[in-house]
Amino acid sequence: MNEINESYDTDSVREFTVSDADAGPYALAEGPDGALWFTLVHRGAVARRDPDDGRVTVHPVGDGPTVIAPGPDGALWFTEYRAHRIGRITPEGHYASFAPLTPEGGPFGITAGPDGAMWFTLSSADRVGRVTMDGEVTEHPAPGAFPSALTAGPDGALWCTLNQGNAIGRLTPDGHGTAYPLPTPGAAPVGIAAGPDGALWFTEIGAGRIGRITVTGDLTEYPLSDPAARPHAVTAGPNGALWFTEWGSGRVGRITVDGRVTSYPLSRTDCEPHGIAVHDGALWCALETGSLARIQVPA
């Protein structure tokens, strides 16, 4: 492990208040309109931050909007964890939602698949679903317990974290699933993203580690200096590294593809960073205490 702690100066990190502390900014994604879209998990809303003037527009949706991702149809798609539905909103604010086949399934992760559809996890039902752009839903058994985040892999499959199965899952578009157990007990993986090296990278919220898995199933784990950091979401950054949020320590981390880790503090240790995404050449993360943080990526 090679971890360096650094402090951002005021030009490197800025925080923007976008809601009251009770609304809960949770996940975020850049939309096809160039704006930053984010979920307000406790308010039942999806919001848009204008890229020019920073104005925030809030759109009411179903209960518990959680993860959000752009779709191939020019809309934003998101999971409604407490409403047990999949939501869709256009850049103009037109909203629709679709019911999975399994009731009370607790949809959480969502991503655009390699087949032109959106894929999502049903964490409470141990299933993975697929919804087409016109709302047709199909489902497959997940290859393990409590599927959480998921992403499209470079091999044409969907990869997901199996939070309570302590494994990483792979699912082909036709529903064939494989689970790869993690070597660390109680790792409880959550976030996952495709890396620039052709592997999948994921967070181990229960073990304070960042993991890497190749498309053939070879696993590597990188421990953080603080085992209680609770790494949550992860994304590929614009500089060839992976960036992740440390929910338990109020920090943002960066890991290179050869395993070098750097950790940066945000304004407060209790700011609760969750989702992280690339937008306007920088990293943005959602702070559940009511703000979005913009982190300028070092050269």
Swiss-Prot record:
It is an enzyme of class 4 (lyase). The keyword rRNA-binding does not apply. It comes from the Bacteria. Its EC number is 4.2.99.-. Mg(2+) binds at residues 272, 288. Keywords: Antibiotic resistance, Lyase, Magnesium, Metal-binding. The keyword Magnesium applies. SUPFAM superfamilies: Calcium-dependent phosphotriesterase. InterPro entries: Streptogrm_lyase, Vgb, WD40/YVTN_repeat-like_dom_sf. One of its GO terms (biological process) is antibiotic catabolic process. The active site is at residue 274. Substrate binds at residue 232. GO terms for molecular function: carbon-oxygen lyase activity; magnesium ion binding. Its cofactor is Mg(2+). PANTHER family: VIRGINIAMYCIN B LYASE. Inactivates the type B streptogramin antibiotics by linearizing the lactone ring at the ester linkage, generating a free phenylglycine carboxylate and converting the threonyl moiety into 2-amino-butenoic acid. Belongs to the Vgb family. Monomer. This is Virginiamycin B lyase. It comes from Streptomyces coelicolor (strain ATCC BAA-471 / A3(2) / M145). The gene is vgb.
